[in-house]
Each structure stands twice: as C-alpha cells, then as structure tokens.
C-alpha cells in the first residue's frame, strides 16, 4: 500500500479543500502520520462491531497507479443507514470526476456485495445530486421511494439493486 500513499494523500487533500468530511471520521491526520496503520484500521472495519457502526468493506479505485476514489460496502443496515447512506457509499477524487469512475466503482462493487451475502442493496442520494443519480441508475437501480428528511435539505432518493447469483443485476 505504501506505493499508493502519495496519490491517496493528494486525493485526500482535494477532498479537504472541498470541505468534505468524507468517510474517515477522525482518521484524517492518522492517514498522513501512519499510512499503514490507517489502512490496517480500514481493513479491520469488515469485522467492526461497535456502537453505531456496521461491518464494512472498503475498496479503492485506482487508475494508472493513482488513487481516484473509494467505495464502501456496508454488510448490513442499521437504522441510521436505512435513512441515509445505505449499503454502498462512494466518493470520486474531485479531479477525476466526470470520467465514469463512480459508475465503474459501483459496477465492480456489486459482485463483492453479493459475495458478502447481500441479495439486495440500498443506495441513497440527494435529489439534487444529478451525478450520483446517473451513477446509480446506470447500474440498474430502481427508485423505490423519496422522502423529505428535513425542510432545509434536498429530497432524499432511495434506490435498490437486486443482486443475481453472479452479483450483478
């Protein structure tokens, strides 16, 4: 993993400049200080069972040896994820957006989700996030519901993808 450290930290810098908290929680500085330990903690999330968290598998997208995005597959849903987040969440490094990275990450993550035992996966996004809507719909998702979560926030969309035995719709 050390050979991806620099490109990962560059991508992290782009997310920080956008002000995105991203998926790290309090690990932002840890990724810079001890990259190997950070990666080990993310790998351990697949077995994590602490209050408020569900086990998750984290995958990185690489293009030409560069970190271009990440996708997380949550092995199950808790109450919070049923409202916002779903089974899969992804981010594309800002300088790589608009190139199909997120669509491909989701496409490749679906067989992994199936291998983890998921038969159907939930993806949520804001009604104003047209890029994410395209990514989700290109991967065969069906919109089952929309909800107002808060008067000051966009409508939330709830998409489901049924996974075949091969892991892809």
Segments (PLM) and residue ranges:
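Conserved catalytic-core motifs of GNAT/GCN5-like acyltransferases
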Residues: 124-125, 140-158
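GNAT-family acyltransferases
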Residues: 1-87, 94, 112, 152-169
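Conserved beta-strand-loop-alpha-helix junction that forms the acyl-donor binding cleft
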Residues: 123-133
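Conserved acetyl-CoA-binding loop-helix of GNAT-fold acetyltransferases
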Residues: 89-92, 98-115, 134-138
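Charged catalytic carboxylate motif
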Residues: 7, 105, 131
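Conserved GNAT acetyl-CoA-binding A-motif
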Residues: 113-124
């Amino acid at each position: 993993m050390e050979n991806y450290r620099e490109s990962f930290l560059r991508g992290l810098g782009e997310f920080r400049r956008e002000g995105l908290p991203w998926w790290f929680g309090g690990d932002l500085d840890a990724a810079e200080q001890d990259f190997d330990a950070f990666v080990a903690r993310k790998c351990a999330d697949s077995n994590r069972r602490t209050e408020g968290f569900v086990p998750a598998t984290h995958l990185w997208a690489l293009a030409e040896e560069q970190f271009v995005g990440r996708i997380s597959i949550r092995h199950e849903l808790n109450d919070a994820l049923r409202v916002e987040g779903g089974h899969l969440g992804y981010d594309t490094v800002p300088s790589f957006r608009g190139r199909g990275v997120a669509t491909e990450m989701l496409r490749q993550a679906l067989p992994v989700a199936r291998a983890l035992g998921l038969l159907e996966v939930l993806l949520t996004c804001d009604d104003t996030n047209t890029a994410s809507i395209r990514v989700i719909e290109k991967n065969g998702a069906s919109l089952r519901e929309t909800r107002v979560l808060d008067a000051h926030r966009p409508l939330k969309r709830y998409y489901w993808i049924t996974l075949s035995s091969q892991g892809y719709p």
